Amino acid sequence: MSVPAELKYTESHEWVRLEADGSVTVGITQHAQELLGDMVFVQLPDVGRALAQREDCAVVESVKAASDIYAPLGGEVIAVNSEVETSPEKINEDCYAAWLFKLKPANAGEVDGLLDAGGYQKLLDSEAH
């Protein structure tokens, strides 16, 4: 299973990419999309919405289940990927390219609380047993 080393991760299976401008891009991990199966619906937060860390802010729905997506960091939504709303299957095709939304973090220090690739792999290994 792919766990890209350059990303950060949450225990609820979101990935976070730190951008050069200080913003973060958020999506769901390969593990999450494999558990959910074929995506059929995505609901994203509104641009401009202020989110608290771990607040449920989006929904992905598959043929198997609906799953809440949580904000990995507190901050303001500065962009959403409307392409995944119209074509949810893009998440299944490449979950690391098919991002969901971008945040301007309110507290950059919250990034330090996220898992690195090694920590996320350990989480996956523990869930498998």
UniProtKB/Swiss-Prot annotation:
GO terms for cellular component: cytosol; glycine cleavage complex. Gene3D superfamilies: 2.40.50.100. Residues 23-104 form the Lipoyl-binding domain. Keywords: Lipoyl. GO terms for biological process: glycine decarboxylation via glycine cleavage system. Belongs to the GcvH family. The glycine cleavage system catalyzes the degradation of glycine. The H protein shuttles the methylamine group of glycine from the P protein to the T protein. This is Glycine cleavage system H protein. It comes from Nitrosomonas europaea (strain ATCC 19718 / CIP 103999 / KCTC 2705 / NBRC 14298).
